[in-house]
Structure formats: C-alpha cells, structure tokens
Regions:
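Conserved beta-ketoacyl condensing-enzyme motif
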Residues: 1-58, 63-85, 162-175, 246-247, ...
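Conserved catalytic cysteine-centered active-site region
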Residues: 3-58, 115-118, 182-208, 289-316, ...
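Active-site pocket-lining segment
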Residues: 6, 122-125, 236-305
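Short, well-ordered amphipathic alpha-helical segments that serve as non-catalytic structural scaffolds
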Residues: 14-18, 42, 120-127, 143-148, ...
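Active-site-proximal alpha-helical scaffold in enzymes
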Residues: 30, 34-64, 72, 128-157, ...
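Flexible glycine-/small-residue-enriched beta->alpha junction loops
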Residues: 57-126
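Condensing-enzyme catalytic core mediating Claisen C-C bond formation in acyl metabolism
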Residues: 97-102, 129, 185-250, 254, ...
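N-terminal extracellular/periplasmic Venus flytrap/periplasmic-binding protein-like
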Residues: 137-226, 289, 294-296
C-alpha cells in the first residue's frame, strides 16, 4: 500500500493493519513511500515480483487522509531541527526567490546543492519561470480539468471507478467532492497567487488537498487463467527518473521516455495519457516536452478537479486510465506523474481484448 506520509494515523505499517482488519492476517503487507507516486511504486513492485516468479497475485493500493495530518511541530519537535544543515544555503535561496527578491535559476549551474526541503508550490513557480509558462496558460488548463471532469460526471463516465463508502453515521459517499461545476475563467483568473507575490500558481490551477484511497489487483496470466478471470490490461513497462528537487514537476518527461524505451514504443504509439495534475504548469511543460496532443491527455479531467490524495493517486489514475481506454476502445495508455523531492514515474498499460 502506498502512503506519502506514513505517520500518525497512517503509521505502524498501515498496509499490515488494513490486511489484518480485513481478516487477511496470513497475507504479508508493506507500506511504501515514494511520495506522490507511492501507489505507482506498489504496482511496479507487484509487476516485478510476478515477472521474477516470486508471486502471482497482489493488491496494489494507496491511501492518504490529508485532512487528518497533524502538525509535525505539535509533537514538540521543531521541523527545522530535523533538516540537514548542509541545505541551509539552498533554503535561504528559496526564501529569497519566494519573496520575489531573486529570480530562480538552476543552482547546480553554480555548483550549489538544490533545496531538498523546498515546498511543492515553489517548485511549480520555478517550472513556470524556467519554461516561460504564463498565468493565463495555467488558468486555461485548470479550467479544462474542471470542465472535462464536470462533463464526465454528468454523463456517468466515471461511475464504475468509484466504490461507495459508508461513513460511521450511515452516510454513503458515492461521488468525489473535489470537482467544482460551473467554474468560469473569470473566477479562476480572479484568484490571487498562493506561493509568491509575483507568482502564477493559484488555487485554481493546482490540485486541492483531498482524502482518498484506490486499489487495483495485479495478477499473473497463469493465476488469472486458473481462476477464470479476464484481465483488463497488462503492464508493459515502467520508468523512473530523477530531476532537481527544485523543478520536480518535470519528472514525468524522463520517466515516460524511459518507460517508452523499455517498452520499445514511441509516444506516437500511445492512445491515451494520464499525467497527474499536481500543478497545471508542470503538466503543460511535460506534455509539450513529450509531444502529447491534448485530445489524448487527461480526457476526463485530472487532479486539479478530483484532488491529489498523495499515496492513492497512482492507483486512482490507473483506474481512470483503464476506464477511459475501455470507453474509447483503444489499446495503449501511459500513466505518469511528478514526485516530490525531484523524481518522476511512468507506467504503460495495454488492454487485453
């Protein structure tokens, strides 16, 4: 099970606690943290284990209850005291840039360490600076996500992706609470920048903070045949990349290229693409670098509308991609995302028909 913050209520090997709760105490379980790509990593681990002949069936899942996070400092620990002092200069540079006192440039060009502790919003602003992506372009993409999500929900296109959840008071949750129907360009354009006085990233062109969980079953073809099950798709290849933490939003570019190389494919072979919408700016930069047409990208909206519960997003996007591939009767799909700390992950799926 993927979880980006496996502490507090998420702690104590959450995956194992869930397995025991489900009556599966005879099934081993592990909680995996690769920040935003945590549940993609669980899928990759299952894929590798099956290919190595070390298992046949895995539940690849992820969860994040962002609303339940406790302030790290509430435990009596100053977060600053946990940071490596070697990054003090990098943190000070980030603070100057955030205050609009300095323009971002890659510190590695000066032989300096990048800021490993940098806030994600600051990395988005850095990508906007590096790639000259305007506020208007970001707002337009954010609006696109909301409108596509609104249309998909209204037409029942994502109903099969959602498992109803019954709350303690008996309320049954059957729909995502993130999308904002009726969002207009005027409303999005009126929002102030969040991270820098002169910034371009707003609440309208980045993902909201949500709670969520998602899961997929990954199984060998041998076991599926034994059980009489028909797989939806097969995993073709995966890819992982590393970039400077200060421009982590560009991680999907190299990760996708590596996955495509491992699969012996080109981006032209891919029918549908899901890039996690942590920030509009990093999706724009990524799809432009990769040469992806918009009519193939996030066709039912993305995290700007639905949210990004970090540990669960990889599995959620996989279900979204599989659903869209079925609805459009296409063969190949690419899922990719940036990862806090300066990484990227990608996974290629092929429908089994």
């Amino acid at each position: 099970m993927g979880c980006a913050q496996p502490r507090d209520e998420h702690g104590g090997n959450l995956a194992r606690r869930i397995a025991v709760q489900l009556g599966l105490d005879n099934v081993p379980a592990v909680t995996v943290n690769r920040f935003c790509a945590s549940s993609v990593q669980t899928a990759r681990m299952a894929f590798h284990a099956i290919r190595a002949g070390e298992g046949h069936a895995y539940v690849s899942a992820g969860v994040e209850c962002v609303s339940r996070y406790q302030d790290f400092g509430s435990a009596g620990v100053d977060p600053e005291e946990t940071h490596n002092p070697q990054f003090a200069g990098a943190k000070q540079r980030t603070q100057r840039i955030a205050a609009a006192n300095e323009r971002w440039h890659d510190p590695r060009n000066d032989g300096e360490l990048p800021d490993i502790y940098i806030a994600m919003g600051q990395t988005a602003e850095n990508v906007a600076t590096l790639r000259s992506i305007s506020r208007t372009e970001q707002d337009e993409f954010g609006l696109r996500s909301q409108h596509l999500a609104e249309k998909a929900i209204a037409n029942g296109l994502i109903d099969t992706e959602i498992a109803p959840v019954t709350l303690a008071d008996g309320t049954v949750v059957t729909a995502d609470d993130g999308p904002r129907p009726g969002t207009t360009m005027e409303a999005v354009a009126a929002l102030p920048p969040v991270f820098r006085p002169d910034g371009t990233v707003t609440a309208g062109n980045c993902c909201p903070l949500n709670d969520g969980a998602a899961a997929v079953v990954i199984m060998s073809d041998v076991r599926a045949a034994e059980l009489g099950l028909r797989p939806l798709a097969r995993i073709v290849a995966t890819g992982v990349s590393a970039v400077s933490p200060e421009i982590m939003g560009l991680g999907p570019v190299e990760a996708s290229r590596r996955a495509l190389t491992n699969a012996g494919l080109s981006i032209r072979d891919i029918d549908l693409v899901e890039i996690n919408e942590a920030f509009a700016v990093q999706v724009i930069a990524s799809y432009r670098d990769l040469g992806i047409d918009l009519d193939r990208l996030n066709v039912h909206g993305g995290a700007i509308a639905f949210g990004h519960p970090f540990g669960s997003t990889g599995a959620r996007i996989m279900t979204t991609l599989l659903n869209a591939m079925q609805l459009r009767d296409v063969s190949l799909g690419l899922e990719t995302m940036c990862v806090g700390g300066g990484q990227g992950m990608a996974i290629i799926l092929e429908r089994v028909t």
